[in-house]
């Protein structure tokens, strides 16, 4: 499937320190070590509604990582999926009296437009689950052949499940205890009470065909894939075993990322599906997580339709640290709009203070677990000096403008 158009990224002189990120599995900030080509997979949207600021904050996080890698001179192989086979999509389509494929196409196109507006760099491969059925079936066949999966004893609906004990290391990614896993599994799409399962935490790989649901033919019977195996199969096909970063929102730590890692590890015998597991915090409104199910969404398209500059939306989301759960508000947006106006005024000056030190500080802060609050504060200090005292460097404004564009994705 076609991705969206890429915004140009200015090339900067020099470089910054090695990128260090918090790894969910290791529970610490540590260096991100890659080869000449850095590999990253980020879980994409389920396209049944418009992009809200919680989505945007997640994809901005991995856009920052992409930009730090480009600044370091790396090639980046970035893959993102679209979960266009999932119950929420089918339920929304049924509610609205629309074909689920048409709904998915419409919302995916809106998402692409939102990402373009926010100047999020596109993935090299942007992959629908429906485009990946063959590789999903192949992966399930491998798990069945190895004993990592089984078919439940149900003549009517012989679903295929993953054995949670198929790998010795299951649970390392989240670090959760069994009680927490069981609770989250039930809350986030699992089916612990399904009769015939060997373990209540065994995850669905293939849902046998039901009346009124889309299905595809497979050697183990017609049906459709489970959620987690879609991502496992796409990663193995597009990037191979052992990627540098698997990413998404913190609500994907368990069960989704734990299981997608375990599925791949069960057939590759690798100890770690990804060298870094990176998760972005949740965005709230009025004290609650912003979510489609709660209905408290602030949508990117809604803000831009009101005339809000997408650069201000981006700055507002970058004002908080990516791992922190944080709230969006009218005050956050107003602060971002004021900051954007000051920055644009400063870089347009005919002369300003030297850009060298502030660019170095921004690089250093971003390399330290994407510390955007301090990076933005460093730029604020330069802007304050430029507006108050001017300077003697005629090239400084353009240099800061290019650095803000290249490293933060904000166009001044």
UniProtKB/Swiss-Prot annotation:
UniProt protein name: L-cysteine:1D-myo-inositol 2-amino-2-deoxy-alpha-D-glucopyranoside ligase
Any single GO BP term: cysteinyl-tRNA aminoacylation
A molecular function GO annotation: cysteine-tRNA ligase activity
Species name: Mycobacteroides abscessus (strain ATCC 19977 / DSM 44196 / CCUG 20993 / CIP 104536 / JCM 13569 / NCTC 13031 / TMC 1543 / L948)
Positions that bind Zn(2+): 43, 231, 256
Chain location of the short sequence motif 'KMSKS' region per the record: 289-293
Species lineage: Bacteria, Bacillati, Actinomycetota, Actinomycetes, Mycobacteriales
Necessary cofactors: Zn(2+)
Quaternary structure annotation from Swiss-Prot or TrEMBL: Monomer.
GO cellular component: cytosol
Reactions catalysed according to its record: 1D-myo-inositol 2-amino-2-deoxy-alpha-D-glucopyranoside + L-cysteine + ATP = 1D-myo-inositol 2-(L-cysteinylamino)-2-deoxy-alpha-D-glucopyranoside + AMP + diphosphate + H(+)
Annotated L-cysteinyl-5'-AMP binding sites: 43-46, 58, 81-83, 227, 249-251, 283
Short sequence motif 'HIGH' region: positions: 45-55
Family statement drawn from the similarity comment of this UniProt entry: Belongs to the class-I aminoacyl-tRNA synthetase family. MshC subfamily.
Pfam families the UniProt entry points to: tRNA-synt_1e
Enzyme class name: ligase
Function recorded in the entry: Catalyzes the ATP-dependent condensation of GlcN-Ins and L-cysteine to form L-Cys-GlcN-Ins.
InterPro entries: Cys-tRNA/MSH_ligase (IPR024909), Mycothiol_ligase_MshC (IPR017812), Rossmann-like_a/b/a_fold (IPR014729), tRNA-synt_1_cat_dom (IPR032678)
EC numbers for this chain: 6.3.1.13
Motif window: 'ERGGDP' region: 187-192
